[in-house]
Amino acid sequence: WKTEDMLSGIEGVMYLAAASGEDLATTSDIVTDALTAFGLTAEDSGHFADVLAAASSNANTNVSMMGETFKYCAPVAGALGFSVEDTAEAIGLMGNAGIKASQAGTSMRSIMTNLTGDVKLSGAAIGDVTIATTNADGSMRSLSAILADCRVAFGGMTEAEKANNAETLVGKNAMSGFLALMNAAPEDIAKVSGAVNNCKDAAKNMADTMQDNLEGQLTILKSQLQELAISFGDLLMPAVRSIVSGLQGMVDVLNAMPDGVKRVIMIVALLAAALGPVLIIIGKTLSL
């Protein structure tokens, strides 16, 4: 992002950094990378920060681990049109089952990839079930709706049937993550879903709570200083570029000089360096 973009979305990111205990640079990377993958802009950074704050505070995970998960699955989620909220909800539910960070990321990526076609499930009690993943116009249904329909079907299966269907649908590596989503308790689903879909000012509220202790205040101060550095960096960049350009010009001139001239300059420089201490000693002697 350009500096103007970074500054336009810095407030929400700064609140998230303060709330999570992460530094501003790390939090900014998490937010900007995910927003880009979802096709969102800097103006959405405040809302995305709120979603992360709400999910991490209502599930067994944190902002850093969620950021790692988004790194793997956000490009696929964005391409399929899945929302940030639904993706964060699924990440939070996986976190409750101990599946976090890159493990959750690879699982989510595989799950989403395998939801591009109709989901076909079977069991002794439910028979053959087909769950549509697309709308009539060809667009993807919401991730939460697809998973909700899958949970209904899985609710009528034996444990062995659940494992077999999960492996068939998403593969061995991702089946543990998918089963975590299928076996999530209704109250946990309602808690995380309610939090991410009603998350306005969640990052700010968490940051305000953090300000009640020294660690939180220091984190906020550090974030504010980093924001100030970004602002000053933008203002000073023209001057710095001018200085660097001038130095490059001097170096070019020196490089273009004949070797004889370079040797003379080097000898003069060495003599000047040697004469300095001598002149100081002479000056002190004469002053006695």
Across the structure, where does each feature detected by a protein language model lie?
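Low-complexity, glycine/alanine/serine/threonine- and acidic/polar-rich repeat/linker tracts characteristic
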Residues: W1-D5, G9-T26, I30-H47, V51-E68, ...
